[in-house]
């Protein structure tokens, strides 16, 4: 796939592109299953590539240094996942392992005059999960797994000058790692239309990447690099439940009332030995709604989404919202002192419906943000208000 973004200086006939960014992603996956009785083993490998093309201009046709160099990331992965049924199929056991090799390559970038550099690293990530079926649809489950977040190419191998600061990559930089443990209880009776699950989870994050800056006392040159320093921890619960009212009548349709809730108990990160609440994390997130599906093909869904408060850094308040600080001094004085802002909670509803016209042809309607809620997912970027989409589909 290709994503291309051109940012213009203004919305006029004389405007020009001052920042152009193109990101190309491609790859493949090859996998197979080995079935031995009721035991199943999946294995395979995959490849993912990202190629960035970025160019910045200070005048029409005059190149300037972009905020980061062009790069190419290549990742190869090998995985093995087994799903075993033991003790007369009362115990479902899943054990897996994944190995990833990632290669970074920074490319020469107009305006930065940086040299081409490359770095690489590899990582192993195991996982194990178990589910024990007790009786009558009741089961307990638990799992443990590790994961990683790939570093940016310039954090690992960069060396370029931008806005007077020399950025130097750290070849010893490790990817951010996480370990997650969860356990819970589930009850499922499809013939009764009932499904319920409760899960408690705890996640540890290690080797979070932070910036490290200093100034050379003799030359006055500013430097910036990256290191693994911080930690984080998150814990909470997830509840999912649904009931199909269609089971009370006949099997011609399903009318499912559903809901799921994530409630965070802990969300903290450690910087220089001090634990603070992690920014941009909501304490509550919930989805709920009503789903209708008829055997003749008509379907409809009303979905609601609730998002709790979130706290972010107040990057744009002084420049674009000069009157906001006066309001914050009255309502959020503690956050104003720390240059933070607490965003309000919101609830958004969406509606969709689809109906078959003739064989293999259907039409549908989406109404997003049904009640025209004004909300943001990121400060300064308000999400679209009420909008409509009409679609038609033909299957072969």
Question: For each predicted feature, which ranges?
Answer:
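Transmembrane beta-strands of outer-membrane beta-barrel pores
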Residues: 2-4, 36, 47-53, 97-105, ...
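Gram-negative outer-membrane beta-barrel transporters
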Residues: 88-93, 200-205, 221-316
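Membrane-embedded beta-barrel scaffold of Gram-negative outer-membrane proteins
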Residues: 1-11, 49, 53-56, 133, ...
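Extracellular loop and loop/strand-boundary signature of outer-membrane beta-barrel proteins
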Residues: 11-20, 27, 60-69, 107-117, ...
């Amino acid at each position: 796939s290709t994503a291309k973004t051109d940012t213009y200086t203004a919305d006029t006939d004389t405007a020009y592109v001052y920042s152009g960014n193109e990101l190309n992603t491609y790859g493949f996956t090859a996998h197979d299953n080995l079935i031995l009785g009721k035991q199943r083993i999946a294995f395979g490998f995959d490849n993912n590539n990202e190629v960035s093309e970025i160019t910045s201009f200070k005048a029409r046709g005059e190149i300037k240094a972009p905020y980061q160099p062009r790069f190419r990331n290549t990742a190869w992965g090998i995985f093995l996942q087994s799903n075993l049924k033991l003790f007369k199929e009362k115990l479902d056991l899943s054990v897996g392992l994944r190995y990833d090799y990632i290669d970074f390559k920074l490319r020469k970038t107009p305006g930065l005059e940086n040299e081409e550099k490359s770095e690489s690293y590899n990582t192993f990530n195991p996982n194990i999960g178990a589910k024990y079926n007790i009786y009558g649809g009741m089961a307990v489950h638990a799992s443990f797994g590790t994961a990683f977040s790939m570093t940016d190419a310039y954090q690992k191998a960069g060396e370029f000058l931008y806005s007077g600061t020399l950025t130097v990559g750290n070849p010893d930089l490790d990817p951010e790692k996480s370990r997650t443990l969860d356990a819970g209880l589930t009850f499922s009776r499809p013939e009764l239309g009932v499904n319920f699950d409760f899960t408690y989870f705890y996640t540890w994050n290690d080797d979070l990447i932070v910036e490290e800056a200093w100034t050379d006392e003799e030359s006055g040159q500013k430097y910036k690099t990256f290191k693994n320093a911080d930690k984080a921890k998150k814990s909470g619960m997830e509840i999912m439940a649904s009931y199909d009212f269609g089971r009370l009548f006949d099997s011609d349709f399903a009318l499912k009332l559903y809901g799921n809730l994530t409630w965070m108990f802990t969300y903290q990160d450690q910087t220089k030995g001090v634990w603070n609440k992690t920014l941009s994390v909501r304490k509550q997130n919930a989805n709920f709604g009503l789903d209708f599906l008829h055997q003749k093909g008509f379907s409809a869904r009303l979905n609601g989404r609730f998002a709790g408060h979130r706290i972010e850094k107040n990057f744009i308040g002084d420049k674009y919202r000069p009157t906001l600080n006066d309001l914050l001094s009255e309502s959020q004085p503690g956050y104003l002192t720390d240059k933070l802002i607490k965003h309000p909670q919101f609830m958004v509803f969406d509606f969709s419906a689809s109906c078959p016209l003739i064989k293999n042809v259907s039409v549908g309607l989406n109404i997003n943000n049904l009640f025209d809620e004004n909300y943001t997912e990121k400060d300064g970027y308000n999400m679209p208000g009420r909008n409509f989409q009409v679609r038609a589909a033909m299957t072969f």
